Amino acid sequence: MEMQEANQGGGSEVSPNQTIYINNLNEKVKLDELKKSLNAVFSQFGKILEILAFKTFKHKGQAWVVFDNTESASTAIAKMNNFPFYDKEMRIQYAKTKSDVVAKADGTFVPREKRKRHEEKGGGKKKKDQHHDSTQMGMPMNSAYPGVYGAAPPLSQVPYPGGMKPNMPEAPAPPNNILFVQNLPHETTPMVLQMLFCQYQGFKEVRMIEAKPGIAFVEFADEMQSTVAMQGLQGFKIQQNQMLITYAKK
């Protein structure tokens, strides 16, 4: 999908559509991690059909996220434009060209070879290589991560130690400066959580345990600041998983 040139430079205002174009991304982030992080951050706005990011030099620092409807794309732009992502603020706008997955769905898809015949400037081997790169790296989300983001079982299904009755829940920890976050997709990285929690004053760090995926500890300077963050992000969705946030036990 050759979208990069279309979104660079000036031009008339782009009509709202279901694909967003993101630039000013951190070029040091590995491609696989970048796609997973983008999926984790943007899936809260709606179903994602495809995420495109390429390793070629002229595509660095850019990505395209294809939603299944325009409303999701519009909300994502409104909420996430200028949002800090891997230490850089994302620049987001509507994509100027339609993705292949959308074109195939609405019947307007034209195979790459036919398109080339109508181009004023022949691309030759260069365009062929770009298309090959797009095919290799622009993987649909449905095929890239089947079953990876499995939801944690409901708390009611978690076995209790020592035969404790499930109708006797353990007393919650008193308010403190460290939050305990549960029900995370197992592929969630510390950076994704840092991007979510760093917008709250007093944020210090995220700690995750490699042997126990799906949980994390987030530390703030004091309990008032951790409480504000908990209230703001309680139930926030990463993939289809709603975060469950409580105070950590000390």
UniProtKB/Swiss-Prot annotation:
Organism from which the protein derives: Arabidopsis thaliana (Mouse-ear cress)
CDD domains: RRM1_U1A_like, RRM2_U1A_like
Quaternary structure note: Component of the spliceosome where it is associated with snRNP U1.
One Gene Ontology biological process: mRNA splicing, via spliceosome
The organism's place on the tree of life at top rank: Eukaryota
Occurrences of domain RRM (ranges): 18-97, 177-250
GO CC annotation: nucleolus; nucleus; spliceosomal complex; U1 snRNP
Bias kind Basic residues: ranges: 113-129
The protein, known as: U1 small nuclear ribonucleoprotein A
Name of encoding gene: U1A
UniProt keyword annotation of Repeat present: yes
UniProt similarity note: Belongs to the RRM U1 A/B'' family.
Region of interest (Disordered), ranges: 108-139
Pfam family, one: RRM_1
Subcellular location: Nucleus, Nucleolus
GO molecular-function term, one example from the UniProt record: RNA binding
Stated role: Involved in nuclear pre-mRNA splicing. Seems to not be involved in polyadenylation.
The entry's keywords: mRNA processing, mRNA splicing, Nucleus, Repeat, Ribonucleoprotein, RNA-binding, Spliceosome
